[in-house]
Amino acid sequence: MFSRLSLFRRAALAPAPMRMSFRTIYQKTEDELPRRIVPKLATFYSANPNHEDRINRLERLLRKYIKLPSQNNNEAQQTKAPWISFDEYALIGGGTKLKPTQYTQLLYMLNKLHNIDPQLTNDEITSELSQYYKKSSMLSNNIKIKTLDEFGRSIAVGKRKSSTAKVFVVRGTGEILVNGRQLNDYFLKMKDRESIMYPLQVIESVGKYNIFATTSGGGPTGQAESIMHAIAKALVVFNPLLKSRLHKAGVLTRDYRHVERKKPGKKKARKMPTWVKR
């Protein structure tokens, strides 16, 4: 009985064990455990990390520049980009993990970014797309964006039939000179004067630009339409957003029609002499 009481007394009088805080325990375990390796890519745990990371970057660009105007179907076909093939992309996009559907997804997003109006693209889009061009076409694929010269002028060249025109367009009061002469003095026909003014009427800017044109070759109609073509191209430099409106009006596309040549045995290109029985 006494031995039991003595044991209880000793246990009661013994000092309590020291309690360690959570911070002390955590510091000890943190020092003992090895450092955790952080994945380089945020898509590390996906089936194809390299491809998914590139898709994420392209999606980020599309969301950022989704409001920029795009080219129409005809212009997109003319400026179709030569992208790298499936085998070439597999070297940087996951190797054997890459699937044809993933490559198709990549091409769709690349074409969406490439079809943005070239006048509005920037270095961020260009540098991202340059990774996917074929090496042989990297140098020839640089798009030169026209800008105003040091005097604030937009310079463009237009052609029609055998006529060629070079125009200088600057913001002003609406003065138009052709080969150093007034428009009414150089073109006597009302139709020729109207064709020159047509691009300005399309964008509702009559009287807002001064135009100085030099033209040579062909007749009055060919010279007037070559000046019209050059003015339309020069106006796009001032405001690239006008390109779609001028293209719909048909003044940005060169008219390649020519007078058909005369054939032997005929009076003109198609006209035959009157047939007489005898």
From Swiss-Prot:
InterPro entries: Ribosomal_Su5_D2-typ_SF, Ribosomal_uS9, Ribosomal_uS9_bac/plastid, Ribosomal_uS9_CS, Ribsml_uS5_D2-typ_fold_subgr. It is found in: Mitochondrion. GO terms for biological process: mitochondrial translation. Gene3D superfamilies: 3.30.230.10. GO terms for cellular component: mitochondrial inner membrane; mitochondrial small ribosomal subunit; mitochondrion. Residues 259-278 are annotated as: Disordered. Its main location: mitochondrion. Keywords: Mitochondrion, Ribonucleoprotein, Ribosomal protein, Transit peptide. Residues 1-10 form a transit peptide. One of its GO terms (molecular function) is structural constituent of ribosome. Belongs to the universal ribosomal protein uS9 family. Component of the mitochondrial ribosome (mitoribosome), a dedicated translation machinery responsible for the synthesis of mitochondrial genome-encoded proteins, including at least some of the essential transmembrane subunits of the mitochondrial respiratory chain. The mitoribosomes are attached to the mitochondrial inner membrane and translation products are cotranslationally integrated into the membrane. Component of the mitochondrial small ribosomal subunit (mt-SSU). Mature yeast 74S mitochondrial ribosomes consist of a small (37S) and a large (54S) subunit. The 37S small subunit contains a 15S ribosomal RNA (15S mt-rRNA) and 34 different proteins. The 54S large subunit contains a 21S rRNA (21S mt-rRNA) and 46 different proteins. This is Small ribosomal subunit protein uS9m. The lineage of its organism: Eukaryota, Fungi, Dikarya, Ascomycota, Saccharomycotina. The gene is MRPS9.
